[in-house]
Amino acid sequence: MTVITRILPVLVYFLVLLPPAYGSETRWIDSVSATVGKDNNSNNTDIYRLGLQNKWNRTWFNGGAWFVGGYWDVSLAYWDSDNDNNGSLYDLSLTPILRLQRDAELSHSVSPFSEVGVGGHLLSEREIGERDLSTNFQFGSHLGVGLGFGDKGRYELMYRYQHVSNGNIKSPNQAINLHLVSFGYAFE
């Protein structure tokens, strides 16, 4: 089975979910993102992720050109390993994220940012490649840096370093570290 046919259920999920969530008066999807990445272990795992974001209606320390805000990130990912056994899995995650960001309107529509997030991941399998993650529930923590650009920072390009592990709920805890690059689009 090719990567495209494995990712198809992920695409269908988001295409079905997106129109009603974006089109309503009480819209709960503010932006979407597409992410690709690799692990930095000897696992040779590729990651393909689609995400939906909902910004919090609150900011802090917003007296100057920089502010702290946050958002919820819901994503569905497909992990593909070179290993014939335990070669793939799906990952559904929910992560609250804090972001330090420059106001795009004060910086000619260019908005650098950094962010941190810790959330829960539900994996379809407990093993990927040679790694035994022990549980289907995992914690994901990440640090990210990026740049918003375009009209009001509508587009985003971001790098994330993400650590996924079971938090020593069960042994073994063979965590995995990921290098991810994302492109995002904000609806407003």
Which residues make up each language-model segment?
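Transmembrane beta-strands of outer-membrane beta-barrel pores
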Residues: 36-42, 54, 74-80, 100, ...
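Extracellular loop and loop/strand-boundary signature of outer-membrane beta-barrel proteins
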Residues: 36-38, 82-86, 127-133, 166-171
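Outer-membrane beta-barrel "beta-signal"
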Residues: 48-52, 175-188
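Transmembrane beta-barrel domains of outer membrane proteins
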Residues: 53-57, 97-103, 146-148, 184-186
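Cleavable N-terminal export/targeting peptides
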Residues: 1-27, 188
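Short loop/turn motifs that connect adjacent beta-strands in outer-membrane beta-barrel proteins
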Residues: 21-29, 57-68, 103-112, 151-154, ...
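Transmembrane beta-strands of outer-membrane beta-barrel proteins
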Residues: 28-34, 66-74, 112-118, 155-159, ...
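Transmembrane beta-barrel outer-membrane domains
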Residues: 27, 41-49, 65, 85-93, ...
